[in-house]
Amino acid sequence: MKVEIIKCLEDNFSYILINEANRNCCVVDPGEADPIINYLQKNKLNLKYILNTHHHNDHVGGNKELKKKFDAEVVGYIGDKNRIPQIDICLSDGEIWKKDIFEAKIYHVPGHTIGHICFHFFKNKLIFTGDTLFSMGCGRIFEGSYEQMYNSLRVLKNLDKDTKIYCGHEYTLKNSEFCLAQDSNNNELLNKIKEIKEKIKQGKTSMPSTIGEELNCNIFLKSNDLENFKKLRDLKDNF
């Protein structure tokens, strides 16, 4: 399975997952349709599934047009069936979704929203975390509680360290500034910041990261106490 990163809107990431044998593909969190359509047509791909991590418009804005144009099925969390546009397949926490070569375990990770999920393609050792886990950050808490977000991150931090992380936004450098302010003597963090700056200078994105890198550099994953996590999240909201 090949993963292509598609930049959408101002700073969103969508992802196209490709079966190179038959050219079938999925798209994760299409914030808008046009960049997805352009890539699919240019590369002669067949869009079969639209995977949504949560209901926010910058992650589902392309659903309607993509479904209409390609007759793709929309996949999302059962608890968000009334909020995800055009949803066809409703999934629950712990369920395995399997179509074609695509196989993912669903993690319900409330915090940013009540109905947020991650798609863990465990055989490929990669996970799409939407706005729950960012590189060197985590999502703002809009609907859930601090405790829910803290527990959701605890679930993700227990994945294999070489699991690749693909998140929903290019927030990495801004996030790194906050991590550095809290953890200024972290050499692994300093090295990762240099690496990311070089990637962006070359016109690339900061994706993917890995669970191992985030355990070393992400101040929110390094937190092992709910009160400490709450303090950090409040500080970041005003950083």
Language-model features, listed with the residues they occupy:
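Accessory terminal helices/loops
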Residues: 154-164, 173-239
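Conserved beta-strand hairpin/beta-sheet module of binuclear metal-dependent hydrolase folds
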Residues: 1-43, 119-130
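Histidine-centered catalytic micro-motifs
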Residues: 50-60, 109-115, 166-172
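Active-site metal-binding loops of divalent metal-dependent hydrolases
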Residues: 30-32, 55, 79-80, 112-113, ...
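Core dinuclear metal-dependent hydrolase active-site scaffold
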Residues: 16, 96-122, 126-127, 158
